[in-house]
Design a protein with these regions (language model features):
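Donor-binding/catalytic cores of nucleotide-activated saccharide
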Residues: 90-205, 209-226
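Extreme N-terminal starter segment of soluble prokaryotic enzymes
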Residues: 1-5
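Short beta-strand/loop segment that forms part of the nucleotide-sugar
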Residues: 31-40, 60-65, 89-90
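Glycine-rich, basic loop-to-helix element that forms the pyrophosphate-binding segment
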Residues: 64-80
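Donor nucleotide-sugar binding loop of glycosyltransferases
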Residues: 13-16, 41
Protein backbone atom coordinates (compact mmCIF):
# COMPACT_ATOMS: atom_id res chain seq x y z
CA UNK A 1 0.00 0.00 0.00
CA UNK A 2 1.27 3.46 -0.88
CA UNK A 3 1.81 6.04 1.85
CA UNK A 4 0.30 8.92 -0.14
CA UNK A 5 -1.89 8.86 -3.24
CA UNK A 6 -1.79 12.11 -5.22
CA UNK A 7 -4.76 12.51 -7.56
CA UNK A 8 -4.37 14.74 -10.62
CA UNK A 9 -7.39 15.44 -12.84
CA UNK A 10 -5.96 16.38 -16.24
CA UNK A 11 -7.68 18.14 -19.12
CA UNK A 12 -5.77 19.55 -22.11
CA UNK A 13 -2.68 19.93 -19.95
CA UNK A 14 0.11 18.86 -22.29
CA UNK A 15 2.10 22.06 -21.56
CA UNK A 16 1.81 22.01 -17.75
CA UNK A 17 1.28 18.44 -16.57
CA UNK A 18 4.92 17.35 -16.51
CA UNK A 19 5.88 20.26 -14.23
CA UNK A 20 3.05 19.36 -11.84
CA UNK A 21 4.09 15.70 -11.79
CA UNK A 22 7.78 16.50 -11.30
CA UNK A 23 6.94 18.70 -8.32
CA UNK A 24 5.36 15.61 -6.74
CA UNK A 25 8.12 13.21 -7.72
CA UNK A 26 10.71 15.49 -6.10
CA UNK A 27 9.01 15.14 -2.70
CA UNK A 28 10.90 13.11 -0.10
CA UNK A 29 8.07 10.67 0.52
CA UNK A 30 8.48 6.88 0.26
CA UNK A 31 5.82 4.72 -1.35
CA UNK A 32 4.25 7.52 -3.37
CA UNK A 33 1.40 6.84 -5.80
CA UNK A 34 0.34 9.33 -8.48
CA UNK A 35 -3.00 8.79 -10.20
CA UNK A 36 -3.58 10.90 -13.31
CA UNK A 37 -7.16 10.93 -14.57
CA UNK A 38 -7.24 12.11 -18.18
CA UNK A 39 -10.67 13.72 -18.45
CA UNK A 40 -11.26 13.40 -22.19
CA UNK A 41 -8.42 15.68 -23.30
CA UNK A 42 -8.30 16.65 -26.97
CA UNK A 43 -4.63 17.64 -27.12
CA UNK A 44 -1.54 15.55 -26.39
CA UNK A 45 -2.33 15.00 -22.71
CA UNK A 46 -3.15 11.31 -23.09
CA UNK A 47 0.13 10.62 -24.86
CA UNK A 48 2.03 12.54 -22.17
CA UNK A 49 0.22 10.67 -19.38
CA UNK A 50 1.29 7.31 -20.74
CA UNK A 51 4.83 8.54 -21.39
CA UNK A 52 5.08 9.62 -17.76
CA UNK A 53 3.67 6.28 -16.59
CA UNK A 54 6.29 4.45 -18.66
CA UNK A 55 9.00 6.62 -17.16
CA UNK A 56 7.84 6.39 -13.54
CA UNK A 57 6.27 3.14 -12.21
CA UNK A 58 4.48 5.00 -9.40
CA UNK A 59 2.25 6.77 -11.94
CA UNK A 60 -1.07 5.20 -12.91
CA UNK A 61 -3.25 6.58 -15.69
CA UNK A 62 -7.04 6.46 -15.96
CA UNK A 63 -8.70 7.70 -19.14
CA UNK A 64 -12.36 8.69 -19.23
CA UNK A 65 -14.73 10.68 -21.40
CA UNK A 66 -14.89 14.34 -20.48
CA UNK A 67 -17.01 14.60 -17.33
CA UNK A 68 -15.44 17.46 -15.37
CA UNK A 69 -12.99 17.85 -12.50
CA UNK A 70 -15.33 16.40 -9.87
CA UNK A 71 -15.91 13.18 -11.79
CA UNK A 72 -12.17 12.89 -12.49
CA UNK A 73 -11.30 13.31 -8.83
CA UNK A 74 -13.93 10.73 -7.88
CA UNK A 75 -12.37 8.22 -10.30
CA UNK A 76 -8.98 8.90 -8.76
CA UNK A 77 -10.29 8.40 -5.22
CA UNK A 78 -11.83 5.07 -6.22
CA UNK A 79 -8.44 3.88 -7.50
CA UNK A 80 -6.31 5.29 -4.66
CA UNK A 81 -4.59 2.83 -2.32
CA UNK A 82 -2.58 5.21 -0.15
CA UNK A 83 -2.94 5.62 3.58
CA UNK A 84 -3.39 9.32 2.81
CA UNK A 85 -4.84 11.18 -0.17
CA UNK A 86 -4.15 14.61 -1.60
CA UNK A 87 -4.92 16.41 -4.84
CA UNK A 88 -2.98 18.43 -7.40
CA UNK A 89 -4.37 20.42 -10.32
CA UNK A 90 -2.74 19.77 -13.68
CA UNK A 91 -1.15 23.24 -13.86
CA UNK A 92 -0.10 23.66 -10.22
CA UNK A 93 2.79 22.40 -8.09
CA UNK A 94 3.74 21.35 -4.59
CA UNK A 95 6.54 23.17 -2.81
CA UNK A 96 9.69 21.17 -2.15
CA UNK A 97 9.26 19.14 1.03
CA UNK A 98 5.53 19.89 1.25
CA UNK A 99 4.23 16.33 1.27
CA UNK A 100 6.86 15.27 3.80
CA UNK A 101 5.78 18.14 6.07
CA UNK A 102 2.07 17.30 5.74
CA UNK A 103 2.72 13.60 6.30
CA UNK A 104 4.99 14.19 9.29
CA UNK A 105 2.38 16.47 10.84
CA UNK A 106 -0.37 13.90 10.28
CA UNK A 107 1.69 11.13 11.86
CA UNK A 108 2.95 13.23 14.77
CA UNK A 109 -0.52 14.55 15.66
CA UNK A 110 -2.56 11.53 14.51
CA UNK A 111 -4.77 13.91 12.56
CA UNK A 112 -7.18 12.71 9.88
CA UNK A 113 -6.79 15.99 7.98
CA UNK A 114 -3.82 18.35 7.78
CA UNK A 115 -4.12 21.66 5.95
CA UNK A 116 -1.18 23.87 4.99
CA UNK A 117 -0.73 27.35 3.58
CA UNK A 118 -0.70 28.10 -0.13
CA UNK A 119 0.46 30.65 -2.67
CA UNK A 120 -2.09 31.98 -5.19
CA UNK A 121 -1.07 33.44 -8.55
CA UNK A 122 -3.81 35.00 -10.70
CA UNK A 123 -3.51 35.49 -14.45
CA UNK A 124 -3.39 39.07 -15.72
CA UNK A 125 -4.90 40.26 -19.03
CA UNK A 126 -1.42 40.09 -20.62
CA UNK A 127 -1.16 36.38 -19.74
CA UNK A 128 1.38 36.71 -16.94
CA UNK A 129 0.63 35.66 -13.37
CA UNK A 130 0.74 37.89 -10.30
CA UNK A 131 0.85 36.69 -6.72
CA UNK A 132 -2.24 37.53 -4.67
CA UNK A 133 -1.03 38.15 -1.11
CA UNK A 134 -3.13 36.77 1.72
CA UNK A 135 -2.16 36.57 5.39
CA UNK A 136 -1.41 33.18 6.90
CA UNK A 137 -3.43 32.15 9.92
CA UNK A 138 -2.16 30.87 13.24
CA UNK A 139 -1.51 27.14 13.77
CA UNK A 140 -4.58 25.47 15.24
CA UNK A 141 -6.19 22.10 15.89
CA UNK A 142 -9.69 20.76 16.36
CA UNK A 143 -10.33 17.34 17.89
CA UNK A 144 -13.64 15.80 18.87
CA UNK A 145 -14.05 15.73 22.63
CA UNK A 146 -10.76 17.55 23.18
CA UNK A 147 -11.60 21.15 22.39
CA UNK A 148 -10.68 23.58 19.68
CA UNK A 149 -12.95 26.07 17.97
CA UNK A 150 -14.31 25.03 14.58
CA UNK A 151 -14.98 28.67 13.69
CA UNK A 152 -11.43 29.68 14.60
CA UNK A 153 -10.05 26.73 12.63
CA UNK A 154 -11.88 27.84 9.46
CA UNK A 155 -10.86 31.45 10.00
CA UNK A 156 -7.19 30.58 10.42
CA UNK A 157 -6.95 27.97 7.67
CA UNK A 158 -8.70 30.18 5.09
CA UNK A 159 -10.61 29.09 1.96
CA UNK A 160 -11.16 25.35 2.08
CA UNK A 161 -9.44 24.04 -1.04
CA UNK A 162 -8.43 20.39 -1.41
CA UNK A 163 -4.98 20.76 -2.96
CA UNK A 164 -3.28 22.15 0.16
CA UNK A 165 -4.59 19.39 2.43
CA UNK A 166 -3.71 15.79 3.25
CA UNK A 167 -6.56 13.41 4.15
CA UNK A 168 -6.54 10.02 5.82
CA UNK A 169 -8.10 7.86 3.11
CA UNK A 170 -10.24 5.76 5.46
CA UNK A 171 -11.86 8.95 6.78
CA UNK A 172 -13.11 9.72 3.27
CA UNK A 173 -14.59 6.32 2.42
CA UNK A 174 -17.94 6.87 0.73
CA UNK A 175 -17.36 10.60 0.28
CA UNK A 176 -17.44 11.95 -3.28
CA UNK A 177 -17.15 15.30 -4.98
CA UNK A 178 -20.54 16.71 -5.94
CA UNK A 179 -20.56 16.49 -9.73
CA UNK A 180 -23.25 19.17 -9.96
CA UNK A 181 -20.58 21.70 -8.95
CA UNK A 182 -19.19 22.40 -12.42
CA UNK A 183 -18.32 26.09 -12.00
CA UNK A 184 -16.53 26.22 -8.66
CA UNK A 185 -17.27 25.65 -4.96
CA UNK A 186 -16.70 21.89 -5.31
CA UNK A 187 -13.75 22.03 -2.90
CA UNK A 188 -15.79 23.86 -0.27
CA UNK A 189 -18.66 21.35 -0.49
CA UNK A 190 -16.23 18.43 -0.25
CA UNK A 191 -14.33 19.80 2.73
CA UNK A 192 -17.46 20.69 4.67
CA UNK A 193 -18.56 17.08 4.24
CA UNK A 194 -15.08 15.86 5.21
CA UNK A 195 -15.25 17.76 8.51
CA UNK A 196 -18.27 15.64 9.40
CA UNK A 197 -16.07 12.53 9.13
CA UNK A 198 -12.69 13.39 10.61
CA UNK A 199 -11.91 13.13 14.31
CA UNK A 200 -9.02 15.57 14.27
CA UNK A 201 -7.85 18.31 11.91
CA UNK A 202 -4.67 20.38 12.05
CA UNK A 203 -3.73 23.60 10.26
CA UNK A 204 -0.10 24.65 9.74
CA UNK A 205 0.65 28.03 8.11
CA UNK A 206 3.72 26.88 6.15
CA UNK A 207 3.15 27.19 2.40
CA UNK A 208 2.87 23.77 0.77
CA UNK A 209 1.27 24.51 -2.60
CA UNK A 210 1.35 26.99 -5.48
CA UNK A 211 -1.95 27.47 -7.30
CA UNK A 212 -2.19 29.18 -10.70
CA UNK A 213 -5.62 30.69 -11.33
CA UNK A 214 -6.02 30.83 -15.10
CA UNK A 215 -8.38 33.31 -16.73
CA UNK A 216 -9.82 30.34 -18.65
CA UNK A 217 -10.67 28.40 -15.49
CA UNK A 218 -14.33 27.43 -15.13
CA UNK A 219 -14.27 28.86 -11.61
CA UNK A 220 -13.45 32.28 -13.15
CA UNK A 221 -16.14 32.15 -15.84
CA UNK A 222 -18.65 35.02 -15.78
CA UNK A 223 -21.31 33.65 -18.12
CA UNK A 224 -24.95 33.31 -17.09
CA UNK A 225 -24.51 29.53 -17.12
CA UNK A 226 -21.53 29.78 -14.76
CA UNK A 227 -23.43 32.10 -12.41
CA UNK A 228 -26.39 29.72 -12.29
CA UNK A 229 -24.01 26.82 -11.70
CA UNK A 230 -22.51 28.55 -8.67
CA UNK A 231 -25.95 29.41 -7.31
CA UNK A 232 -26.97 25.75 -7.59
CA UNK A 233 -23.83 24.74 -5.70
CA UNK A 234 -24.76 26.97 -2.76
CA UNK A 235 -27.46 24.59 -1.53
CA UNK A 236 -25.23 21.49 -1.10
CA UNK A 237 -22.47 23.70 0.31
CA UNK A 238 -24.71 25.28 2.94
CA UNK A 239 -26.21 21.90 3.84
CA UNK A 240 -22.76 20.36 4.30
CA UNK A 241 -21.58 23.36 6.35
CA UNK A 242 -24.66 23.16 8.56
CA UNK A 243 -24.04 19.51 9.39
CA UNK A 244 -20.32 20.12 9.98
CA UNK A 245 -21.10 23.00 12.33
CA UNK A 246 -23.64 20.88 14.20
CA UNK A 247 -20.92 18.30 14.81
CA UNK A 248 -18.17 20.65 15.91
CA UNK A 249 -19.72 23.78 17.40
CA UNK A 250 -20.67 24.08 21.05
CA UNK A 251 -23.24 26.54 22.42
CA UNK A 252 -20.62 29.29 22.66
CA UNK A 253 -20.05 29.19 18.88
Amino acid sequence: MAKISVIIPAYNAETTLRTAVESILSQQVPELEIIIVNDGSTDGTDRLCHALASEYPCIHVITQKNAGICAARNRGMEAASGEYITFCDDDDLFWQGALHLLLQTAEDTRADLVRGGYELLRQRPDGTFAEQPHPAGSPCTIALGRGGSYGAFLENSGPQFVWNALYRRTALLGLRFNERCSYGLEDFVFNAAAYRRVGKAVYIPQVVYRHFESAQSTSCAHTAQALLGRIRALEPWMEAEFHAAQRWCGPEE
